Amino acid sequence: MDPANSSRPQPESTTTAAERTDNERSRLLRAAMDVLQRNGWWGFKVESVLRQAGLSTRSFYRHFDKKSDLLLALLEYELGGAAVNLRRVTAAAATPSDKVRAYVAATMDMAYREDLVKPSSLFASHWREMLPEYPDAFDRCVAEMMAPLVEAIREGIANGEFTSEDPEADAVAVFYLVAGVTADQATLGGVTPREQLEHVVMPFIQRAIGLR
């Protein structure tokens, strides 16, 4: 080996470069959530995020074209976490009926559980404004969140527990009903008692799929 070459800096490995890129993006997302929680939607500025993260403008544009792209990434992260939780709670339930009830309860938690309501409220009031710009991304997020419900309804049909001619359509109806009232309550601060919402939502679900 040429001694002259041995002292030269070696090219950074692809893995290390990828890890550094991921770390930088994670720092931006963490800082963005901190700024959003502190300043709210209307006080959210890219400059504040960069100060919080200790990163440059160049760092921002390596990952995002504009502020709304960063907000979308935050929303995808939050909804991705929600989807994981929904799958976990439904998987832990014993019967299809239990799975659907667990799914509904976990969704409503986002408007009433103290550790979940803050991020839920930040996005609940503005996701409709972002929807026209990012319809495909929203469709993917909804499909991921809705998947455990679709599976539970299909399982209930297969064992004769539910009656549904179109489990996916029924899952869509149930999802948007529950997610809609949850988003409203997250925005309003949970002014309507949870039990009252359950009395409205559950009879509809029972009629729609034969929930026991």
Feature-to-residue mapping (PLM):
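Generic hydrophobic, amphipathic alpha-helix propensity
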Residues: 21-32, 49, 74-82, 86, ...
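Amphipathic C-terminal alpha-helical segment
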Residues: 109-113, 151, 155, 174-192, ...
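Amphipathic alpha-helical packing segments from all-alpha helical-bundle domains
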Residues: 80-83, 132-159, 168-173, 199
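N-terminal intrinsically disordered/low-complexity leader segments
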Residues: 1-23
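Hydrophobic alpha-helical connector segments
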Residues: 73, 77, 87-114, 171-174, ...
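Short secondary-structure transition hinges
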Residues: 108-150
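Helix-turn-helix
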Residues: 27, 35-69, 73
